[in-house]
Amino acid sequence: MPVSEASVSAGRRARLGGLYVIVGGADPVAQARAAIGGGARAIQVRMKDAPAGAVLEATRRILALATGRALVLVNDRADLALLAGADGVHLGDDDLPVPEARRLLGPDLLVGRTTRTLEEARAALAEGADHVGYGPIFASRSKALPVPPRGLAALAEVARALPAPVVAIGGIGLDDVAAVARAGAACAAVIEAVLGAADPEAAAARMQAAFEAGRAARGATP
């Protein structure tokens, strides 16, 4: 069931806009610090092989950095998002179904879902997701792709069709991020474009500024 517009998650959903950085690896807290320092609007904590306790600790530390500055979502683990006091969870193909995550988290936390087609995106929203990740938009800079890149035209179609934020993901770099915003994405999700840079904080600042310029060009209010 779609989430009520009166819920707290609706307020969080309204804040989904701008650079969305996925952190993990050896030092996700340092990565998040740099990304938030550069103006990232959302952080996704993705620590695939880490023990639950390590994910919980890192998420709590990132939340302390992000207060009043960025949303923090946990990858996969709705239980850890709830325990940490995060803003929500992002679910992939092998994670909890959206309705079960919503039942665990209640109406106040964000539930995002990976999608690759407009049909999948509509289904995720119908099941109770607040927003969708959509992609890959371009060839990925960090991993092999299960499907061909979707491109900007498909992103624009999805963004126009959905009554909820679309987080674009897949191969987005500094040269692409303004076009992603102009296509209607609420957020541009990145890893290597920020975390692979010599100065991640400066890279985040450049990408956030470019995203805002693209959003302004399509006539949206920053």
UniProtKB/Swiss-Prot annotation:
Single GO MF annotation: thiamine-phosphate diphosphorylase activity
SUPFAM superfamilies reported in the protein's UniProt record: Thiamin phosphate synthase (SSF51391)
Cofactor(s) it depends on: Mg(2+)
Uppermost EC category: transferase
Reaction catalysed by this enzyme: 2-[(2R,5Z)-2-carboxy-4-methylthiazol-5(2H)-ylidene]ethyl phosphate + 4-amino-2-methyl-5-(diphosphooxymethyl)pyrimidine + 2 H(+) = thiamine phosphate + CO2 + diphosphate; 2-(2-carboxy-4-methylthiazol-5-yl)ethyl phosphate + 4-amino-2-methyl-5-(diphosphooxymethyl)pyrimidine + 2 H(+) = thiamine phosphate + CO2 + diphosphate; 4-methyl-5-(2-phosphooxyethyl)-thiazole + 4-amino-2-methyl-5-(diphosphooxymethyl)pyrimidine + H(+) = thiamine phosphate + diphosphate
InterPro entries referenced in this protein's UniProt entry, alphabetically: Aldolase_TIM, ThiamineP_synth_sf, ThiamineP_synth_TenI, TMP_synthase
EC number in record: 2.5.1.3
Pfam families hit by this protein: TMP-TENI
GO cellular component: cytoplasm
GO BP terms in the entry: thiamine biosynthetic process; thiamine diphosphate biosynthetic process
The family this protein is said to belong to: Belongs to the thiamine-phosphate synthase family.
Name used for this protein in its record: Thiamine-phosphate synthase
Organism name: Anaeromyxobacter dehalogenans (strain 2CP-C)
